[in-house]
């Protein structure tokens, strides 16, 4: 195999596909990046056995063929190349020679016949959504996905698609995040909805390679796998299976207290209070709503913080405490001018949602404080 391509093109491709590499691969071959040169393109593929990412780059292919090179080392080497054009030639012993201007390197490879073929969904339910919209949806909920849990289903994110809207739902046991995209979706075969759980790691990596464009990302699902295609990139992953939590049952039907406050003011006050909260044993922030005042406070052995802001309160006064990180994660993902918080008591969930509309919804469990 031999081809010549632009160094930046090669590096962009490697930076994309190596996101699928595992820190602890189950097989040595999965430490590598698979290269397939044919026609006027080279396909780069990496996989951890569950997640695979493939990207096609333009190249001047002199000799078609396949190769597997050490993924991280090849990427770092490509990053250090002087620029311009790079020529890569792989011989019968699987070793690669890499030539770029005055730079010459040789890299031991592996047998490409040992590399597993990328699994794709050939037939299934297809959903198309603009890349920028999907990227935004992921960024608004991914923080609420459980990183470790006895229930593996919570380490994923629920995607629900109906003819008029799509929803991403994440739940880690302490927080619930829902982000909607209201737009028409064509569901094949008269289906009324699609409901799948995508691994959190997959969504994290997708959000980093999706473009800021209204060009579509095509998602194809079967019962156990999803294939996503956008631009010159294809991603394939297994889906999580099992009984997910019915999040609708968690959402309160009504509220005793509603508070409106300036979102930027609340965020800045919480950021300052968090500095002190992190020094305490429980990382707590207290919020006290009374009359037209919101008091945000935290304390530790080293000191304390008290911030007061104006608020519009409807209903009963309330004092409630939250884990500083959980409340910070939520508020940083809101862009509305006004922050709308709804409560029933200081031991029941707080819901943060738009003052008008239903684009997003966040639910946070408070921390019970004994005084």
Give each language-model segment a name.
Residues 1-371:
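Structural preference for solvent-exposed beta-strand-turn elements
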């Amino acid at each position: 195999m031999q081809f010549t391509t632009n160094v930046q093109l090669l590096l962009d491709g490697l930076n994309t596909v190596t996101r699928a590499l595992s820190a602890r691969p189950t097989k040595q071959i999965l430490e590598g990046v698979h290269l397939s040169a044919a026609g006027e393109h080279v396909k780069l593929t990496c996989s951890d056995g569950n997640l695979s990412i493939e990207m096609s780059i333009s190249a001047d292919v002199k000799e078609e063929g396949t190769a597997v090179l050490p993924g991280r080392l090849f990427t770092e080497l490509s990053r250090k190349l002087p620029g311009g054009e790079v020529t890569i030639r792989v011989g019968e012993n699987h070793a690669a020679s890499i030539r770029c201007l005055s730079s010459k390197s040789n890299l031991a490879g592996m047998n490409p016949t040992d590399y597993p073929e990328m699994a794709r969904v050939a037939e299934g339910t297809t959903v198309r959504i603009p890349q920028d919209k999907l990227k935004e949806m992921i960024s608004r909920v991914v923080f609420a996905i459980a990183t470790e849990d006895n229930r593996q289903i919570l380490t994923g994110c629920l995607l629900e698609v109906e003819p008029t809207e799509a929803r991403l739902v994440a739940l880690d046991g302490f927080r619930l995040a829902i982000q909607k995209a209201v737009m028409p979706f064509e569901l094949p075969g008269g289906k009324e909805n699609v409901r799948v759980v995508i691994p959190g790691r997959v969504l994290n990596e997708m959000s980093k390679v999706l473009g800021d464009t209204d060009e579509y990302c095509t998602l194809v699902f079967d019962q156990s796998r999803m294939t996503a295609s956008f631009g010159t990139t294809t991603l394939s992953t297994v889906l999580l299976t099992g009984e997910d939590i019915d999040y609708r049952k968690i959402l309160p039907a009504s509220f005793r207290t509603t508070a409106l406050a300036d979102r930027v003011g609340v965020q800045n006050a919480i950021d300052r209070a968090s500095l002190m909260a992190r020094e305490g044993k429980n990382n707590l922030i207290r919020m006290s709503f009374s009359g037209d005042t919101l008091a945000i406070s935290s304390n530790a052995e080293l000191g304390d913080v008290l911030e007061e802001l104006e608020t519009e309160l409807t209903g009963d006064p309330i004092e409630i405490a939250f884990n500083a990180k959980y409340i910070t994660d939520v508020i940083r993902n809101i862009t509305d001018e006004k922050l709308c918080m709804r409560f029933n008591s200081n031991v029941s969930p707080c819901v943060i949602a738009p003052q008008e509309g239903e684009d997003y919804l966040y639910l946070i469990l408070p921390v019970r404080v004994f005084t």
